[in-house]
Design a protein with these regions (language model features):
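Short active-site segment of divalent metal-dependent hydrolases/proteases
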Residues: 14, 161-162
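Active-site-proximal alpha-helix that buttresses catalytic centers in soluble enzyme cores
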Residues: 7, 13-82, 112, 133
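Active-site signature of alpha/beta-hydrolase-fold catalytic machinery across serine-
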Residues: 75, 164-168
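Phosphate-handling substructures
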Residues: 78-141, 191, 199
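Short, well-ordered beta-to-alpha junction loops that form the rim of enzyme active sites
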Residues: 63-66, 92, 157-160
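Alpha-helix C-terminal capping segments
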Residues: 143-151, 190
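Generic beta-sheet signal
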Residues: 6, 59, 148-160
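Domain-level recognition of soluble alpha/beta enzyme cores
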Residues: 136, 172-198
């Protein structure tokens, strides 16, 4: 049986994304650009589902519990002419927790915790922010989510969970994924053949 195909969308931009603040588990709303990105991702997804012969009415849709992911999901589903709120929530898709660094820019985090910041710079996958979690921990919960999929799925979540999924599926290494930019307004397709990005 082939591995499930995941159509993965990162949430649209927020005010904190725009100014480089670490969001983590904070619930920051989409900004105007973020709304447009979400609708665009829905349009891109519609084309991909048509290309792949998938019935949008039969595919499961699942989102992170954070508001920016849920708002993006509802805009995506609206673009697909589906009931906006008819989707599942899975806590394993929540963003990496940055603990005490949430709300800070990277420069502010470095000024506050220079020693830990330096260690994390060297090993971003395994070193967590104070009171936060490591990418390795995120990878464990995202891997658990993926193993439980019964079939092809549309997921809306975060940059951190995308990186963790890419490593879980063997498409990236922890070193390559740690600094990988995950685009907003795009659809990433993960399948047996690898990963592709569609904008």
């Amino acid at each position: 049986m082939p591995a499930p195909v995941v159509y993965y969308i990162r949430h649209g931009e927020t005010a904190w994304n725009a100014i480089g603040r670490l969001q983590g588990t904070q619930d920051i709303a989409l900004n105007e650009l973020g709304h447009r990105q979400a609708i665009h991702a829905g349009d891109v997804l519609a084309g991909l589902l048509t290309r792949d012969g998938r019935d949008r009415h039969l595919l499961p849709f699942v989102a992170s519990p954070l508001g920016r992911a849920r708002a993006t999901m509802e805009l995506v589903r609206g673009a697909l002419d589906l009931p906006p709120q008819d989707y599942a929530i899975d806590d394993r898709l929540r963003e990496i927790a940055y603990g005490a660094w949430e709300g800070s820019t990277l420069a502010e985090a470095q000024a506050r915790d220079p020693e830990l910041y330096g260690r994390r710079l060297v090993d971003k996958w395994n070193v967590a922010a104070p009171g936060g979690e490591s990418y390795a921990a995120v990878q464990a919960r995202v891997s658990d989510w993926y193993r439980g999929l019964a079939g092809d799925t549309v997921a809306v979540a975060h940059g951190g969970t995308a990186r963790a999924l890419m490593v879980s599926l063997g498409f990236e290494t922890p070193q390559s994924a740690a600094d990988l930019f995950i685009e907003q307004g795009a659809v990433y397709v993960f399948n047996d053949g690898g990963q592709t990005k569609h904008v």
